[in-house]
């Protein structure tokens, strides 16, 4: 059996040596075909980046709505109520701004993928993109509940293995030109280690 395997390897090596020119196929060509390199002229005028306030308010209510009939932790209910109260005061905090940015991208059909050690909750408990019910730990992800036609939203708490996770997301980003792919360092020296 070992000899058969060695013979097969030798045969393949002999075949490979007979090929004079290797053909390299760009496997990402198809997903990037609608894009081109930027030109100097592209930066003369800034693109429109604003979002309609009425639509932002609708999205804010949507991403801060927790489906009824489930038992949530009081702390989570207060957080979501406080977020809705922010809308009335016309003052948003960083977390709400971040969630709204994701919501607008998703609403416009772009995908968003976030990974990192503590991204579902947010390192300092600011995000709570994933909420777990108190009684059975069912996961509720409001950013997945915006509309039937929204972009795909994925969020993953990863292992404390920066090289592997960042490497995976770097490759994932190459294959997802219409998506926002984020690897989030928790805090401290994790970012430097991954670099």
What spans do the regions from the language model cover?
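Flexible, glycine-rich loop/tail regions that form catalytic "lids" or insertion modules at the edges
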Residues: 1-195
């Amino acid at each position: 059996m070992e000899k058969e395997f060695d013979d097969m390897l030798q045969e393949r090596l002999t075949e490979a040596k007979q090929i004079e020119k290797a053909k390299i196929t760009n496997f990402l060509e198809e997903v990037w075909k609608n894009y081109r390199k930027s030109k100097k002229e592209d930066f003369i005028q800034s693109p429109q980046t604003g979002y309609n306030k009425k639509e932002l308010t609708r999205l804010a209510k949507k991403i801060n709505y927790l489906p009824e009939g489930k038992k949530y932790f009081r702390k989570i209910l207060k957080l979501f109520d406080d977020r809705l109260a922010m809308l009335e005061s016309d003052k948003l905090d960083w977390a709400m701004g971040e969630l709204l940015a994701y919501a607008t991208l998703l609403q416009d059909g772009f995908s968003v993928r976030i990974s990192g050690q503590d991204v579902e909750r947010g390192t300092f408990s600011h995000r709570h993109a994933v909420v777990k019910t108190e009684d059975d730990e069912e996961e509720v992800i409001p950013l997945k509940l915006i509309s039937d036609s929204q972009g795909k939203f994925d969020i993953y708490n990863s292992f404390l293995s920066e090289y592997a996770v960042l490497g995976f997301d770097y490759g994932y980003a190459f294959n997802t030109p219409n998506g926002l792919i984020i690897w989030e360092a928790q805090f401290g020296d994790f970012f430097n280690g991954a670099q």
